Structures are given as structure tokens and as C-alpha cells.
Design a protein with these regions (language model features):
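RNase H-like, Mg2+-dependent phosphodiesterase core
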Residues: 1-214
């Protein structure tokens, strides 16, 4: 079977965006990365793509290799009309809960764009309150809209880079090995080395895990 080109992969996503643009004009795609892990920020990105300078290969970032995501990240940053990346830290997640923290991050990302869009497309099934323009949720939006897919890549790569730096600073937690999810190894390392400020304490409590004296 012939392997599809990047242009062929992205064609349906750009066709979707063209239909949206024909109705609303300028619009932004928004997505997040890192809602589920035990530590680190949730990262949110908003992106307005330039239809005259497409970025081929865009798709749901989870379906792309790390090498491909990195290459797309650089191209999106170069070609996008506007983009904004926001990190929402564990302190905000613990205070507001992960859903509200993510919604707040989405609002910040949209408000931080250099261009004000007429519409915002949000990956998922809900939209943040308080936006000054219409917003629509798009289930599996990162595999439906090129703009949401681009935001997905920006968010995923930004968070991955952040977590790789944490892994270098705190090698004893082996963050790269367990991908910061609630694995047996991860809990054992937390019990041994304690809870650092980058951990989401509300997530540890929800999992019924709270090391005594740590």
C-alpha cells in the first residue's frame, strides 16, 4: 500500500478549516496537552493558521512521532498568523481542579493571540466561559481541523520539552521512563524521594496516595 503524503494526510483537515473560514473568516484552534499526568503543568495552545501558507502533515499530535511533532512545531511557529502557548501550573490545578484550570488556560491562550479571531474552535466537548467571541467544541478536533491539530502539536511539544527539562533536573524520579503517569514505579519513587512542587497534590490524593511524612 502506498504511503500517504503529508499533504494528503492534512487535506481533509484543511478542507474542514476552509468551510469554517468561509462562514466566519479568521478563526483559532485550541487544544491542550498533559491533563492526565501526576505532575507538571497542563499546556494549552491557540493557533491561527495562514491558509496561504499551509503546514502539511498536521494531525492529532498523539498519532505523530516525536521527530515529526518537533519538525511541525517549528514550521507552525514560522508560518502561523498568530499563536499563543500557556502553561498552567500544579498550584492552579490543585486550587481550581484540572477542568477549570484547563478552561482558564484556554481563555488565556485565546486572549493572548496577537490577532482577535471571529471564532474559536476547541478540541473536546466543552468551551471555556468568558470568551469575547463565539466558541464551538469539536470532538476529536485535533484530527478534524488543521487549526486545532496545529494547536495540539504546539501544546504537546511545549509540554514535552518542559518535562524533559524537569527530568534533567530531577533524574531520580525517572520522569521520562514512566511518562509521569500513575504507575507502580512512579509511586515507589515518590515514596522514596518525596513530593516536589511540580507534583499535582490533588491528583495524588484522588489516587488515594499520600506518602506519610513526605
Amino acid at each position: 500500500m502506498k504511503r500517504r503524503s503529508d499533504e494528503e494526510i492534512s487535506a481533509p483537515l484543511y478542507a474542514y478549516d476552509a468551510d469554517v473560514r468561509a462562514q466566519y473568516g479568521c478563526f483559532a484552534g485550541v487544544d491542550e496537552a498533559g491533563r492526565g499526568p501526576l505532575c507538571g503543568p497542563v499546556c494549552v495552545a491557540a493557533c491561527i493558521l495562514d491558509p496561504e501558507h499551509p503546514v502539511y502533515g498536521i494531525n492529532d499530535s498523539k498519532k505523530l512521532t516525536e521527530k515529526k511533532r518537533e519538525a511541525l512545531f517549528d514550521e507552525i511557529v514560522e508560518k502561523a498568523l498568530a499563536y499563543k502557548i500557556v502553561f498552567v501550573g500544579p498550584d492552579i490545578i490543585d486550587r481550581d481542579n484540572i477542568l477549570n484550570a484547563t478552561m482558564g488556560g484556554m481563555r488565556q491562550a485565546v486572549e493572548g493571540l496577537d490577532i482577535v479571531p471571529n471564532l474559536v474552535l476547541i478540541d473536546g466537548n466543552r468551551t471555556p466561559a468568558g470568551l469575547t467571541m463565539p466558541a464551538q467544541p469539536v470532538v476529536k478536533g485535533d484530527a478534524t481541523s488543521a487549526s486545532i491539530g496545529a494547536a495540539s502539536v504546539l501544546a504537546k511539544v511545549s509540554r514535552d520539552r518542559y518535562m524533559m527539562e524537569l527530568d534533567r533536573q530531577y533524574p531520580q524520579y525517572q520522569l521520562a521512563k514512566h511518562k509521569v503517569y500513575p504507575t507502580k514505579l512512579h509511586y515507589e519513587l515518590i515514596a522514596q524521594y518525596g513530593i516536589q512542587p511540580f507534583y499535582r497534590r490533588s491528583f495524588l490524593k484522588k489516587q488515594g496516595y499520600w506518602p506519610e511524612g513526605k
